[in-house]
């Protein structure tokens, strides 16, 4: 039994139950969320506070992405030549687009120098270790770019929401996380922390799409399903985590990802504009879209 009184651990379920998203949509989803999804066209933005009414056009997206991926190739060449170490942490709401954003970063990079770290639940041995220990072994070596698809921030959010850690463990995490990250930065690691945030209606629409698409059903995890009723608990945990782990030396970059195309471009621009690498085309890099990209103050806008 976890601290919330439940004996069920969604991490131990063998797969996402067929039809669970549809049942939630029909029987339990808030009426305004359900109506927004039912009335919308495919490219409509569902959030009423998002600064754009529709997704970026595919033509504009492709043109900008191609230019940015050329810059990423330059960045990787500089990382390899200079021995730099770069670590990118991707956190966010479920279905916010973390994996897709990482994919666009790596699309034209040499995979030998651009690793993805996506850890499963900790083993018994790992649970007995210092919490950060299993993440440390995956930090970048000289010449490497490492993408964490979820990271040590599991403790601040999902572990807390599902009762997989107690309050003492979580408080210890918050006491240690900023000194830990400052040590990484002081040692020369370029550290970028991304929080991708998506509105409730858009999240449910993406879950529903995954459930109906045989090629995407693997993306729908038991934790996603179990979390459908925990939106408010997630909101509180996210707010606490961003507030307590943001600093000038290891800041959070929050990206509103209701439009995946704009979110991917903003994330890539954040990294490219944050590192001085050789032969940078500053006009091509530009600046992240401030309407959807900023600090913790915009996360729940």
Curated annotation (Swiss-Prot):
Transferase found in the keyword field: yes
SUPFAM superfamilies: P-loop containing nucleoside triphosphate hydrolases
Compositionally skewed regions (Basic and acidic residues) per UniProt: 1-12
Signal peptide extent: none
Source organism (scientific name): Ruegeria pomeroyi (strain ATCC 700808 / DSM 15171 / DSS-3)
Name recorded for this polypeptide: NDP-polyphosphate phosphotransferase 3
Pfam families found in the cross-reference section: PPK2 (PF03976)
Main enzyme class: transferase
A GO molecular-function descriptor: polyphosphate kinase activity
Cofactor note: Also accepts various divalent metal ions.
Role played: Uses inorganic polyphosphate (polyP) as a donor to convert NDP to NTP. PolyP hydrolysis is slightly faster with UDP, but it can also use ADP, GDP and CDP.
Record's catalysed reaction(s): [phosphate](n) + ATP = [phosphate](n+1) + ADP; [phosphate](n) + CTP = [phosphate](n+1) + CDP; [phosphate](n) + GTP = [phosphate](n+1) + GDP; [phosphate](n) + UTP = [phosphate](n+1) + UDP
Alphabetical keyword list: Kinase, Transferase
Positions of region (Disordered): 1-21
Family: Belongs to the polyphosphate kinase 2 (PPK2) family. Class I subfamily.
